[in-house]
């Protein structure tokens, strides 16, 4: 029973952290790929899953270390992947397309205080990844990576699953939460300053329910092994 409670807490909390982290990630979808919207030019699930997979790999590399080391390593792996992706994206937007990173959803960047309106191309929602979106993306990577690492720890250390099976299940849980967040966002999001970020409570409830169900399934799956 103690093991079930531990798994329930870790997987549910990890799922919520992943879901919340996805809402911080600046995703612009197809419009961003054409430099007509702020964010990285890909889908929410793809970008979140990419950073999550990186976080799981870095967490698994420290699987014999204490809990906090695994957690922090997963967070750093996902955040580093997000930072590199956004930085390379900005290089392409600035030096390839020739447009400055800016947002049409705020008059001034909440972090730097720089004016945005003068740099937004008419008819677009901004372009590139401005400072506030960049910082938001790193925060999302830290949350998502640590959440994924928490799920991996529950499966590998607490339930005693093999590293391969724990990694596969943790990735599946990550994808499920990324899809839940994607449906909740409904398209593109620039980060924590985006009006869509206020939809977060609904996503947390959905992730809570999913985490409980996933915990029970994972626990009883481990008893069959």
UniProtKB/Swiss-Prot annotation:
InterPro entries given in the database record: MeTrfase_D
GO BP annotation list: methanogenesis, from carbon dioxide; methylation; one-carbon metabolic process
Topology of the protein relative to the lipid bilayer: Multi-pass membrane protein
Top EC class for this record: translocase
Coiled coil segments of this chain: none
Similarity annotation: Belongs to the MtrD family.
Official protein name in the record: Tetrahydromethanopterin S-methyltransferase subunit D
The species this protein was found in: Methanopyrus kandleri (strain AV19 / DSM 6324 / JCM 9639 / NBRC 100938)
Annotated gene: mtrD
């Amino acid at each position: 029973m103690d093991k079930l409670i531990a798994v329930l807490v870790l997987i549910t909390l990890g799922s919520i952290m992943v879901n919340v982290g996805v809402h911080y990630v600046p995703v612009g979808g197809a419009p961003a790929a054409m430099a007509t919207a702020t964010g990285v030019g890909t889908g929410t699930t793809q970008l979140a899953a990419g950073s999550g997979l990186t976080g799981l790999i870095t967490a698994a590399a420290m699987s014999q270390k204490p809990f906090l080391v695994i957690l922090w390593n997963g967070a750093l792996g996902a955040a580093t992947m997000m930072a590199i992706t956004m930085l390379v994206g900005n290089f392409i937007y600035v030096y390839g397309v020739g447009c400055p990173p800016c947002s049409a959803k705020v008059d001034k960047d909440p972090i730097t205080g720089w004016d945005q309106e003068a740099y937004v191309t008419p008819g677009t929602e901004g372009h590139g990844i401005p400072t506030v979106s960049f910082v938001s993306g790193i925060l999302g990577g830290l949350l998502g990576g640590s959440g994924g690492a928490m799920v991996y720890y529950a499966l590998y250390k607490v339930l005693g699953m093999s590293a391969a099976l724990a990694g596969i299940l943790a990735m599946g849980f990550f994808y499920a939460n990324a899809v839940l967040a994607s449906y909740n966002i409904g398209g593109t999001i620039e980060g924590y300053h985006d009006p869509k970020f206020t939809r977060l409570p609904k996503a947390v409830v959905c992730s809570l329910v999913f985490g409980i169900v996933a915990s029970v399934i994972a626990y009883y799956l481990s008893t069959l092994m």
